[in-house]
Structures are given as structure tokens and as C-alpha cells.
Amino acid sequence: MPRFYNNFMKIRNALFLLFSVFVVKSFAQAVEQQKDSVQNLEEVVVSAQQILGSKFQARNRTGSAYYISPQEIQKMGYTDINRMLKAVPGVNVYEEDGYGLRPNISLRGTKAERSEKITLMEDGILASPAPYSAPAAYYFPNAARMQAVEVVKGSSQVQYGPFTTGGAINMVSTAIPTKFLAKLNATYGTNNTLKSHINIGDQKKYFGYMVEYLRYQSDGFKHFENKQYAGFKRNDLVAKFRVNTAKTEGANHSFELKAGYADEDSNETYVGLTQSDFARTPFLRYVGSQKDQLTTRHYQWVGTYLLQFSPRLKFTTNFYYNTFFRNWYKLESVKYGTLASEKRTIGQILADPETNAPYFDILSGKTDSRVFYNDYEHLKNNPGLFVRANYRNYFSRGVQTKAEYKAIWGNCYLDNEWGLRYHTDEEDRNQWDDLYAMKNEQMQLLWKGIQGSQANKITRANALAAYWLSKVSYKKLTVTAGLRFEHIELLEKDYTTADTRRTGQKRIETSNIANAVIPSLGLHYNLSASLSAFAGVHKGFSPPGVSKERRVMDRNGNITLLTENQKPESSINIEAGLRVSKQQFKTELIGFYNNYSNMLGSDLAAMGGTGTLAQFNVGEAVVKGAEFIAQYQPFPEDAPLKTPLQLSYTFTDTEMKNSFESNSWGRVVAGDEIPYINRHTLNLSIGATYSRYELNIGIRYSGAVRTEPGQGLIAERQKIPAYTIFDASAKAKINNSLTLTVNTINLTNKTYLVSRHPSGLRAGHPFGIFGGIIYKVN
């Protein structure tokens, strides 16, 4: 362990020294810059919490980017991040709960499960509970309180890691207003779904503040046979306070403190439905899931210090600390007899309910489980339902700083950025099983397990990241070059289920170290006043885990278990595109090609695995595709009627080049496609605004999806059929303070399948209508 720590400290100190040299050199150049050059410098003001800041910035990057503006979010009144992202080309999502509470997001064909292969940020800070040691965790910032969402892909994302293959998503929270503002945004509707979002804030010369509270709850659209619904409740409280100087000359300082608390209590489950039950009653919940409940608590603290010497030179430093607790108490397996072999997981039962009929009858409450033993020592050997407490604690903390330097040298515009981050995160698993008997469709506790008897380990990561990005513009050409460095040290301490008190007598330690140099290069050229071309190439990277096991299958189907140090995910990613931007018409067409030398998968319970989260080597793979978006406003800006139109389309083709076997994916044969990646997605939005009234319609088409690796025609039991969903919204602005809203989702009340995982079939949200008000005082 001392060597593990000393190596890390040596690299950290060397990079801090290198960063200091860059900063000193930049500052010296900035001091020498002439005043008239400063006055001619065009500066786009972007807050410290944003990476794009506007649609204009997104359209003028050397790589692919999309900015979901506050106006765009307000159009449809969405609270579901899946629906917010539907218009963004290159994004694949598949639903799980119907409300976007735990989204599965893929960017350019990365694995979608638990959004584990994207860099997720809130206000530019890593938002996942443990992005290095356990990226597939059950936390996603509440989309209902965000004022903007930023998506960067391709060579646009070298500053944002550790995941650089697909892209990054930055959730931009409510900012401190420029003047006094109090706002209420409340909706109520189908299934007693309530959203109440209130915020108040103000800004003076030397300070500003903002406080907001979000309450989001619903009875849910799934119900038990007794018509009892299974819903959720969420609370979110955020406060920001900033102090600053306001000099007209010289350096200015500001410090902003952000504190947040969020919780959730939901009756969510992993238990889906059988094929036949889904066809009859798609919104049914089996009584065997009546005890399933997810409880989460999240705390965040962020301090942001901004030092701005001039419009050309500024430094931004963030100190952050996040904690996340979650206990998903959910049905794991069913036991029919007293023998260990008479036990089946819920995935096995629902995949073949006929063969596992005795287990399914207990799960569905058709028959009671028997009790053979009454003494405490043997209670756990009884038949019944085993409910697992997936009890976990996470923390992440770190400090990151960046320096930005802009200048004009003759006909050249130069924009340099250097960044450095030191980060630590940890996942603590301490899980157990409880045994319940089924009697008269009610679950009764028989035996309570010992904490730590199912999983009992701590995984920690220390990471040092540094990057440099330089953009040079000369006449019609812009060249962006970047370099990122990641040094990661992982350590897993498995106390084993035999040492639930964690005495350390049976502790197993496994470690792994990863280093990566990640270059990127992007070009942007203005072919004419309205037409531009761009291209980029960059290295994709994803941190490894500590697992060292790999199962390889030969041509005859024989499995060989290999022991090796797990390598990081690595790929070479290429993109090229064209942009057209006229007054009322804008379009973009991009082709991308991601060539993996080593793709990583994860053993997720959400994908039918054992839930260890251990990563496994998939090996070589290719993901390629095309992204298209077009925006058109037929009428001039000063016309009383506006009818904005937007069309986006994504084509994605995936292929794994190796044969292997895993807990999550089973047997994979070379040529198989990656599961849960849409080959075709299309989104169309149509709006109409006249005077104080506004109407918007969104149409989303999702092509057929493969739920397990395979090739050729998709088998019916491994398929999510294609579907088209219509959403709509209407607004009436009564006066400058009050606006009335009506939002609908799934306007045609279509019953559609969204997932066959974690266990069984799941339906998307049925028709929902929600009336609301937006009231502002300023």
C-alpha cells in the first residue's frame, strides 16, 4: 500500500508542477499583450458551470455538440431526462421506470445500462456517486430542476473525463438570477403525479443567492391485483450563495458555495412480467414484489472560486464533496423446497415460467409457500421469497482547476485551456438477504439476514487527470488540438461474507493501475457564409475495474477461464460532418466511426448478471453511424405567427469482433450486435406560437431493439418492437407573471414494450395529462 500511494503522489506532484509552468507562461504572455488587442478580442461569456452556454457555441465547435436551452426544456414541460434527450442526435436511451428516475443513456453506441459509459456532470462537476470505482450506480440528478442540458461528443470532449468514447452530459442547474426573481412551476395530473418546483434568488453588486426546492411524486402507473399502486416520492433542495468583487480595472474574484440535498422513497422493483401477462395486463405488479422499496439520500457541496485578471485570462477552481446512500430492498430469488438447488432467481423464473411453475406461483401469489422449520437456526432453509437489501454507501471528493487564456495575434485567434483534477471516490457494499413466506398473497418475514452476508467489500479509486486544449482560428480555418492524461489507482477490499464484522482476518485485496494519454484533433472550415465542414479524431477511454477474470470461448464453444490484469477500454474515434446555417434554416449531418481495441462490459443485475459490477473484457468492436438534424422556421422573426420545425435522426450499427461468455450477456459470438442500441431513431417536433399562446407536438420513433447479443433477424423473445410515441403541450400566457400549461405524454395511449431487463417485460408510460401554472415575481 505505501508503494501504491507513493507512486500516485509522485505523478500528482509532477503534473501540478507542469500545470504551474503552463500557467506562469500564459500569465506572462497575457501581461505583454497590448490593450488595443484586448479591446478587439471577441469574448463569449460562459458561466463557470457550463461547457457550451448557448446553441451558437454548440454549432461552432470543431466536434459534435448539442445545447438544450431553457426555452427548449420549457416547451414540453418534461421532467423525464429520457424525453429531454430524445431530440439530440447520437443519443440512445431505453426506459426502465417510465419517469426517467434511473435512465439508461448511450452516446454513439456506448453501453446504455445505468449510463455507465458517459461522463455525467452537474455544473461541470462529476455527478455519479463513484465515477471511477462504481460508475453504474443508481443516481441521476433530477432533470426537473435543471435549466439546461449540454451534450458533447467526439473530439469536443477531451476536457471532460474519465469516459471519452461516447461523450459527456452536463446538467446545468438553476443559476443565481441577475435580479430578484421568485418562481413557482407546478403541475398535477394522471396518477396523482405532482411536480412543485419553487426557487427564489437575487443578485446585488457584491453578492447573490438562490434557493430552490423540488417535490416530485406519483402513485405510478403500475399496480398490484388489488389495485394498489406503486409510486415514488422525491425531494430536492439546493442553495447557492456567491460573493464577488466588481472592479472596472484589475483582477476580479468571486466565490460561490453550492449545497444540495436529495432523497427518494419509491416502491420500484426489478420484477417485470412474463410474455403472456404483459399481453393481458401490461401494468401489473406481482405480489411477490410488494416489499420492494428503494431509499436514497444524496448530499453535495461545491465551492467555486473564479479569478479573472482580464477578458483574456481567468482561473476557475472547484472543490467538491458528494455522498450518496441507497438501499434497494428488492426480491432476488424464490425457493420452492428446502434444498439449495430448489432456488431460482427472478430472471430465471420470468424467462421460463412454465418450467419454473412452482416458483412462479409463489411469486405471483397463486400458492402459499410452505414452512418446514420453526427454530431460528433452520428458518433460513425454508421455502419462500428472498429479498435482498442492496445496501451501499458512496462518496466522491476532489479539487479541479482550469486556466483559460484568449488572445489575438495578427489574424489568428487563440484560445488555450489547461485543467487539472485530483479525485477520490469509494463504494461500500454491505448487503444481506431476508426470507419471507407467502401467505394469502401477503409476504410475512420469516428470517432476517445478517448485514454483510451477501456482499461485503469496499472499492476505492484515486485518480489524477490533466488536460490541455488549444484552439487556433485563422480566417476560415479553426484547428483544435487537445491532450488528456488519466492516472487511476483502484483498490478493492473484500472482507468476504464470512467476516461480516470486518475484522480483516479474511480480507482479500485486489488492485489495478491504469494510465492513459488521450489525444484529440479537430478541424472546422467555413466553406461559405452559410456552409462549413468539420472533422475530428480522438482516443476513447474508459477506466477498468479490479476484476481479473476473463472467459474466452473458442470456435467449438469451449470456455477457458483466464486470469489477467484488466485493461482500460480503448478506441480510436473518427467523425466528419457538414453544417448549414442560414437565417431560418439550420442543418447538420455527421458520420462517426468508433473502432474499439478493447471494449468493457459490466456484470449488472440490471442486465441479468449477478450484480457484482465487475467489468469484463469484450475485446474488439466497431460502432459506426450517422447523425442528422434540421431546424426550420418558415416565417420571419418579426412575424406574429411562428411555426418552428425540427427533425433529428440517428443511425447506429454495432458489431463485436470476439467470442466470449459473461454473466450479463451469456455467450457472445463474433459478429454479434451490442444489446439495447437502437439501429434507427427519429424525432420530429412541430410548434406554433401566436401572441400569448403556444402549442408543441413531439413525435418519437424508436426502431426495433435487440435485448441480447445476436445477429441477423431478432428473435421475438429478444426483441423490443419498434414504436412511435406522440407528446404534446400547450401554454397560455395570461400576463407577465402567470402562464397556464397543459402537458400530455403518450397522446394516443399506446401500450409499448421498453425493456426485457432487469427481469421480465416492462411497459412504457401510458397516456398522461398534467395541468400546471408558472408564476413569476420579479
Give each language-model segment a name:
Residues 43-76, 101-104:
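N-terminal periplasmic "start-of-domain" segments of outer-membrane beta-barrel proteins
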Residues 82-129:
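Extracytoplasmic beta-strand/coil segments of soluble accessory domains associated
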Residues 125-153:
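Short acidic/polar hinge/loop motifs at secondary-structure boundaries
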Residues 181, 188-217, 225-269, 293-310, ...:
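Transmembrane beta-barrel wall of Gram-negative outer-membrane proteins
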Residues 248-255, 296-497, 588:
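Face-selective signature of the C-terminal outer-membrane beta-barrel domain
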Residues 308, 314-320, 324-328, 526, ...:
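Membrane-embedded beta-barrel scaffold of Gram-negative outer-membrane proteins
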Residues 394, 412-425, 450-595, 642-643, ...:
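Structural signature of Gram-negative outer-membrane beta-barrels, strongest in the C-terminal barrel
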Residues 473, 488, 586, 591-600, ...:
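Gram-negative outer-membrane beta-barrel transporters
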